[in-house]
Curated annotation (Swiss-Prot):
It comes from Danio rerio. N-glycosylated. Disulfide bonds join C30-C178, C52-C56. The gene is epo. This is Erythropoietin. One of its GO terms (biological process) is nucleate erythrocyte development. The keyword rRNA processing does not apply.
């Protein structure tokens, strides 16, 4: 009897969360283990591509965000500037990884590409749950100084891992919504 009532309670909770017609805001996702899951998947993709040599070159160089963090500069930025940098980086990574879908890829590589694109979309959803501003494209078309060009798929996935471990983690760890209960 308890098993059935527990399952029923779980079903009621799920239905409550997914009830159509309610426009309730997303609950903040402050647990960094969520990001750790995405980092692990990105790391798995990078590890799989490490052994790839000739088959992993990219026809044209792609632009990706720089992953190094100058902590003095980062701490001096307000949350909107930090959010814009992370959202911009996620946008660049999504564009770069998405550009790989055009070429003929192995099934393994294609699965890593698809997973990475889904993960970036999920990370954006996590940021949205934390009321972090969406990506706003820059008004000038000048080349951003916070970017680099890369020429291999393994480099791309390495940048993806490092970006998530660095700037994305810093932003999530210090999101104002998550710090409200901390004194």
């Amino acid at each position: 009897m308890f098993h059935g009532s527990g399952l029923f309670a779980l079903l009621l909770m799920v239905l409550e969360w997914t009830r159509p017609g309610l426009s309730s805001p997303l609950r903040p996702i402050c647990d960094l283990r969520v990001l750790d899951h995405f980092i692990k998947e990105a790391w798995d993709a990078e590890a799989a591509m490490r052994t790839c040599k000739d088959d992993c070159s990219i026809a044209t160089n792609v632009t990706v965000p720089l992953t190094r963090v100058d902590f003095e500069v980062w701490e001096a930025m307000n949350i909107e500037e930090q959010a814009q940098e992370v959202q911009s980086g996620l946008h660049m990574l999504n564009e770069a990884i998405g550009s790989l879908q055009i070429s003929n890829q192995t099934e393994v590589l294609q699965s890593h590409i698809d997973a990475s694109i889904r993960n970036i979309a999920s990370i954006r959803q996590v940021l949205r749950s934390l009321s972090i501003p969406e990506y706003v494209p820059p008004t000038s078309s000048g080349e951003d100084k916070e970017t680099q060009k890369i020429s291999s798929i393994s480099e791309l996935f390495q940048v993806h891992v490092n970006f998530l471990r660095g700037k994305a983690r810093l932003l999530l760890a210090n999101a104002p919504v998550c710090r409200q209960g901390v004194s």
